């Protein structure tokens, strides 16, 4: 008999995380969900629910409780993150972004890695962003923390391989997605629907893709970005 597959989605209260959790449940996964706003998780149909604030010191303990409620964990999916344009470099926005996307990300991904190392296998997938490709002046801390996330996942993948650990990694890099994260007066180009992005994410996870840029337009865009010299990039007005 095939073993039941168990996934935990952190940051499942809205947007991409919510859609991925729903899709996994529809596909027969045993799913545990977590977020700061647990009241938004009740109708999702998950097997287990836990309140987790990734910026809190007790977040790893809460993850452990969720794993116990679920009866194990085969995939850890990290969808928790914040981001704002901050052209005035407001200190509070910069530091809050680093706290969630930097410290919180490291805390949760690290705990999942240690759990899978003890277990002997596992799969870590996380939403990062195409914003980590280059330094984006309108959103300095967001861009910088996304680059950090890209490199952190790559570093852990290299470490796991060198240690002989059976841990897979999938770095999900969406373009602009129509979620609350990008709500406001500014109209972003080439917006993606979260439902479409979720399908692409679940496909990438099931095929054990190392990096998945979503979608083809953003794969083309980031390929061009990488080739722009620094002296040209700094003169581009975004």
Regions found by a protein language model. Name each.
Residues 77-85:
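Conserved NAD(P)H cofactor-binding loop of Rossmann-fold oxidoreductase domains
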Residues 129:
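Residue(s) in the substrate-gating loop at a strand-loop-helix junction
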Residues 13, 21:
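N-terminal Rossmann NAD(P)H-binding glycine-rich loop of SDR-like oxidoreductase domains
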Residues 86-99:
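Short alpha-helical oligomerization interface
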Residues 171, 186-222:
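C-terminal helical subdomain
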Residues 109, 145:
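Active-site helix of classical SDR
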């Amino acid at each position: 008999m095939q073993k039941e597959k168990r996934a935990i989605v952190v940051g499942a209260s809205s947007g991409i995380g919510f859609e991925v959790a729903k899709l996994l449940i529809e596909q027969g996964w045993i799913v545990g969900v977590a977020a700061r706003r647990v009241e938004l998780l009740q109708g999702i149909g998950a097997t287990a629910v836990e309140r987790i604030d990734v910026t809190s010191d007790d977040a790893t303990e809460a993850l452990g409780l969720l794993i116990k409620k679920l009866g194990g964990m085969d995939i850890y999916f990290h969808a928790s993150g914040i981001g704002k344009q901050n052209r005035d470099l407001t200190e509070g926005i910069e530091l809050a972004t680093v706290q969630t996307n930097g410290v919180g990300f490291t805390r949760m991904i690290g705990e999942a890695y240690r759990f899978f190392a003890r277990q002997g296998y596992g799969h870590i997938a996380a939403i990062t962003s195409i914003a980590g490709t280059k330094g984006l002046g309108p959103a300095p801390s967001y861009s910088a923390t996304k680059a950090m996330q890209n490199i952190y996942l790559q570093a852990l993948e290299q470490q796991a391989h060198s240690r002989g650990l059976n841990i897979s990694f999938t770095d999900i890099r969406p373009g602009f997605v129509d979620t609350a994260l990008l709500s406001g007066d500014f109209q972003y180009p080439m917006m993606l629907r979260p439902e479409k992005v979720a399908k692409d994410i679940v496909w990438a996870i099931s095929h054990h893709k190392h990096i998945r840029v979503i979608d083809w337009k953003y794969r083309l865009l980031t390929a061009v970005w990488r080739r722009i010299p620094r002296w040209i990039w700094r003169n581009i007005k975004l």
